[in-house]
Amino acid sequence: MFMKGLVDNVRPGPSGMDVITMHAVARIMLNNWIPSIQASWVKEGSRMSQLLLTAGVNDLGGTLINEGISTAAGAQHGQLMRPSVFRQMIREAGRIPAERYTTYKTRRVFNDTDQELDPLDLVGDDVEGVFGSYNRLVKLDTYRFEHPINSSAKV
């Protein structure tokens, strides 16, 4: 609504303090009833996500490739964060990095000296060339819905 100017007096989004407050209050109010509170690095960026690790957040989500939902909504923070960058960011916040399964069970805890590279760490600078681009994908007519009445395809 903000980006397209559809509604008057709509803010471009929450302030940084709004974001911190929301996560901190969620941690206090939920009182570990929901044990994992995640920061969306795609929406908030790496620096804000790192700060949120000190304000109730204990999960940074994962490495997303060709993510489209946040990108379509205007997120500006990238399509890929390499695992080694995640671990460095977590350590710099004074936390211990761990990898989890989708079910939130811990898969692996990384120690201070772990410098293991993940295959995604080895992807070059041309991330869109390797994985594709959401912005290019949505411009292709190939995947657009065409109502059967207007379609030239034979059914």
Predicted regions and their residues:
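Auxiliary Fe-S-binding modules of radical SAM enzymes
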Residues: M1-V155
